[in-house]
Amino acid sequence: MAALTPRKRKQDSLKCDSLLHFTENLFPSPNKKHCFYQNSDKNEENLHCSQQEHFVLSALKTTEINRLPSANQGSPFKSALSTVSFYNQNKWYLNPLERKLIKESRSTCLKTNDEDKSFPIVTEKMQGKPVCSKKNNKKPQKSLTAKYQPKYRHIKPVSRNSRNSKQNRVIYKPIVEKENNCHSAENNSNAPRVLSQKIKPQVTLQGGAAFFVRKKSSLRKSSLENEPSLGRTQKSKSEVIEDSDVETVSEKKTFATRQVPKCLVLEEKLKIGLLSASSKNKEKLIKDSSDDRVSSKEHKVDKNEAFSSEDSLGENKTISPKSTVYPIFSASSVNSKRSLGEEQFSVGSVNFMKQTNIQKNTNTRDTSKKTKDQLIIDAGQKHFGATVCKSCGMIYTASNPEDEMQHVQHHHRFLEGIKYVGWKKERVVAEFWDGKIVLVLPHDPSFAIKKVEDVQELVDNELGFQQVVPKCPNKIKTFLFISDEKRVVGCLIAEPIKQAFRVLSEPIGPESPSSTECPRAWQCSDVPEPAVCGISRIWVFRLKRRKRIARRLVDTLRNCFMFGCFLSTDEIAFSDPTPDGKLFATKYCNTPNFLVYNFNS
């Protein structure tokens, strides 16, 4: 059959189109299994033509070795189909195990060839094979169908029986001479292979904390590498400075001659300074650099000369180590030179310090001013901001729960304290159109004494009065001013005394406070004066002030303290008055030199 069938097919060999159609129907995807790479559509057309010619001529060449067709030397690719496979005498279907074996054999062949021809293969790939991009590296991993054939190259299939098929193949690759491609080919010589093509491993980017750790390690390595080089350069610079002092002097002289006409005036001074510096260079290495001083003109010229040579830039570090703190006050013109970067850094640091000082000053000024920030939103509510209770007189913030709680407590206690119920045998000593004054003695009933104690506690809290044990508690007299609303709005506690001290008047200067603003501190004389009545406490309810309640209480005291006698202002004294009490005593006595007692000396 093998001898007869080619003759039958040879008769119809002139009909290439029908033969090609027949082979395509018989083997629908010969190129799908064995074609991996193809450059363009033109190569695909050449492939079909070469296959047609091969099918026609293969009938005459059935007795070849290995039953494989010879490659057409005119075409860039070999035929992918043999006569044996065409007549179904060889099984072309490969199960997954057989495919795995083929891949392993192919990889071993490639490894052995690479070991034998390591250097020439690398050079050949450097010249001929261009570097594939990421897109081309990703595409071979997809399904190898006819849809992707124009993007891949055509390679002859490898059989299990023939392991030397790579030697029989002839692959034509374009030669592109590029340095970048050569470099990438060398780097990727040991890269992993996918479908017998070398690809780059996917770049993994370090993320999170690993990125910063890697960066720090690289910086440390670079710093360690740079340290020996810096030490060598510094040593070389120091050697050049020690050996060539005369050369630097000559260079500076030539540079001074090139300066603008303004510097020509300072040329003679510069020469003298440079000669003295070169002669005393060794001595200045031992001495302190801060002993000598340099004129401002020489320093300016030295700044211009600092740009002339690199040797003069490094002399600061070697010759004058102490001048690094304040290089302006360095020993000589040679030692006082600084580079442009150091000068810019010093100027920038000075400007930065000035800016920080200005910011600190502005911040202190802002904090010294009273802040007027609105801490509560005004949404048109009725109770907003600081409010004054009409009953107890406490100032509180209505929207603050803490203030409201404190107000409720104080309000309840205050109302209980000033509330006056009255009793039958009360002692009324004076009556007015807006109230009356009631006198309470120590021998009165207990409910009256209890009421006096409540009022006294409230008065002591408001005045900040220091509790003092009275000398004669049985002779204390308490005067309460009761308003028409049945509330205690004024209180005066008096006790008998024998002597008091006169308050010394203070000189009123242009900067001293006015008479309406009385200071807390006051002075009194050491000479005691006789007195009869001492006012221990006098208090008026906050909302009832400026209604002459305190004056009426003192008038009643002067009239009722001693039977049948009206006391003068020189016979009454006040105990350690507050600023408001001092102002009241000054107005009531018509003199700032009133009498005081019971004070802490």
From Swiss-Prot:
GO MF annotations in UniProt: acetyltransferase activity; L-lysine N-acetyltransferase activity, acting on acetyl phosphate as donor; N-acetyltransferase activity; protein-lysine-acetyltransferase activity; zinc ion binding
Record bears the keyword Ligase: no
Polar residues compositional bias, start-end: 306-315
Catalytic activity entry: L-lysyl-[protein] + acetyl-CoA = N(6)-acetyl-L-lysyl-[protein] + CoA + H(+)
Pfam families associated with the record: Acetyltransf_13, zf-C2H2_3
Disease: Roberts-SC phocomelia syndrome: An autosomal recessive disorder characterized by pre- and postnatal growth retardation, intellectual disability, microcephaly, bilateral cleft lip and cleft palate, and mesomelic symmetric limb reduction. Severely affected infants may be stillborn or die shortly after birth. Patient chromosomes have a lack of cohesion involving heterochromatic C-banding regions around centromeres and the heterochromatin regions on the 1, 9, 16, and Y chromosomes. Juberg-Hayward syndrome: An autosomal recessive syndrome characterized by cleft lip/palate, microcephaly, ptosis, hypoplasia or aplasia of thumbs, short stature, dislocation of radial head, and fusion of humerus and radius leading to elbow restriction.
Enzyme class per UniProt: transferase
Keywords attached to this entry: Acyltransferase, Cell cycle, Chromosome, Disease variant, Dwarfism, Intellectual disability, Metal-binding, Nucleus, Phosphoprotein, Transferase, Zinc, Zinc-finger
ZnF region ranges: CCHH-type: 387-411
Protein purpose: Acetyltransferase required for the establishment of sister chromatid cohesion. Couples the processes of cohesion and DNA replication to ensure that only sister chromatids become paired together. In contrast to the structural cohesins, the deposition and establishment factors are required only during the S phase. Acetylates the cohesin component SMC3.
InterPro entries associated with the record: AcTrfase_ESCO_Znf_dom (IPR028005), ESCO_Acetyltransf_dom (IPR028009)
Enzyme Commission designation: 2.3.1.-
Protein name: N-acetyltransferase ESCO2
GO cellular component term, pick one: Golgi apparatus
Residue stretches of biased makeup (Basic and acidic residues): 282-305
Subcellular location: Nucleus; Chromosome
Domain notes: The N-terminal region seems to be responsible for association with chromosomes, thus excluding any involvement of the Zn finger in this process.
GO biological process: chromosome segregation; double-strand break repair; hematopoietic progenitor cell differentiation; mitotic sister chromatid cohesion; post-translational protein acetylation; protein localization to chromatin; regulation of DNA replication; sister chromatid cohesion
The encoding gene: ESCO2
